[in-house]
């Protein structure tokens, strides 16, 4: 059983929901990333999504695009992201870490080498935004052989066939994108989310995490009624952008604790 699967079993047994924050590796400062990851755990995060910066993040809105640009400007690569996970693992061997990014850096490294190095670094899952499930059977199998959960996106526009394909090859959790468009959007309709999630559950018993448009404790709580976990990304990146010098770590921990408290209430 994978670390992510075990975590969701524990959450379900205790009647809790998962909290999955996203940060971009290397933003605002590569030297700060591991410290931010530990702050996420202290605040009550269940899983950490660590974004691999990319020059053309097509699914991301301006907030995460800026974040990627800042990280790339500071020389962050897929290799340095893996080094950050390795450093994080020196103090935390239990919190699942998912690498989230785009196909190009992985393909440049090669899927076989990526799987080997990611596993050695302590990565538990991988979500490649521009890998549709129907084209990734071999990639998903290679990840599972390495002990890494392949995670896939579903959206309001996903066909029944795509839902079935994702259900067949995904493990860990499925990431349901709550709305059309890019990350950072704010028009979240929780009724739409609640109506679509049961259709996904008809095809799979894999936990469903919902992201896009979750900006605060209230929206996180509302989405968690139907989802197994909530994902927060752009709001966190904005918080880090706006944090006064030297206060990013504490600001992040405080914000995550507010979300955790809301989910547990």
UniProtKB/Swiss-Prot annotation:
Pfam families listed in its UniProt record: Trp_syntA
Enzyme class: lyase
Entry's Gene Ontology molecular function annotations: tryptophan synthase activity
Pathway assigned in UniProt: Amino-acid biosynthesis; L-tryptophan biosynthesis; L-tryptophan from chorismate: step 5/5
EC number: 4.2.1.20
GO cellular component: cytosol
Protein keywords: Amino-acid biosynthesis, Aromatic amino acid biosynthesis, Lyase, Tryptophan biosynthesis
Catalytic residues (UniProt): 49 (proton acceptor), 60 (proton acceptor)
Catalyzed reactions: (1S,2R)-1-C-(indol-3-yl)glycerol 3-phosphate + L-serine = D-glyceraldehyde 3-phosphate + L-tryptophan + H2O
Cited SUPFAM superfamilies: Ribulose-phoshate binding barrel
Alphabetical list of InterPro entries matching this protein: Aldolase_TIM, RibuloseP-bd_barrel, Trp_synthase_alpha_AS, Trp_synthase_suA
NCBIfam families tied to this protein: trpA (TIGR00262)
Xref: HAMAP family: Trp_synth_alpha
Subunit structure comment from the entry: Tetramer of two alpha and two beta chains.
Family, similarity comment: Belongs to the TrpA family.
Record function comment: The alpha subunit is responsible for the aldol cleavage of indoleglycerol phosphate to indole and glyceraldehyde 3-phosphate.
Protein's recorded name: Tryptophan synthase alpha chain
């Amino acid at each position: 059983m994978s670390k992510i699967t075990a975590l969701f079993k524990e959450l379900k047994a205790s009647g809790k929901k998962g909290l999955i924050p996203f940060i971009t590796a290397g933003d605002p400062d590569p030297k700060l990333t591991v410290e931010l990851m530990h702050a996420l755990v202290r605040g009550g995060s269940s899983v950490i999504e660590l974004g691999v910066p990319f020059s053309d993040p097509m699914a991301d809105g301006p907030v995460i695009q800026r974040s990627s640009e800042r990280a790339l400007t500071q020389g962050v690569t897929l290799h340095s992201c893996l080094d950050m996970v390795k450093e994080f693992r020196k103090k935390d061997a239990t919190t699942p870490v998912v690498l989230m990014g785009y196909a190009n850096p992985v393909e440049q490294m090669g899927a076989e080498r990526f799987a080997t190095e990611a596993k050695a670094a302590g990565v538990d899952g991988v979500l490649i935004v521009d890998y549709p499930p129907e084209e990734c059977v071999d990639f998903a199998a290679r990840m599972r052989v390495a002990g890494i959960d392949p995670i896939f996106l579903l959206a309001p526009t996903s066909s029944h066939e795509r839902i079935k394909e994702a259900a067949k090859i995904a493990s860990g959790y499925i990431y349901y994108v709550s709305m059309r468009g890019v990350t950072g959007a704010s028009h979240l309709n929780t009724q739409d989310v609640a109506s679509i999630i049961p259709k996904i559950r008809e095809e799979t018993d894999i936990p469903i995490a919902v992201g896009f448009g979750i900006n605060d404790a209230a929206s996180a709580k509302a989405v968690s009624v139907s989802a197994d976990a909530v994902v927060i990304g752009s709001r966190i990146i904005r918080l880090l952008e706006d944090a006064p010098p030297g206060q990013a770590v504490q600001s992040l921990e405080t914000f995550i604790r507010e979300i955790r408290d809301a989910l547990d209430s």
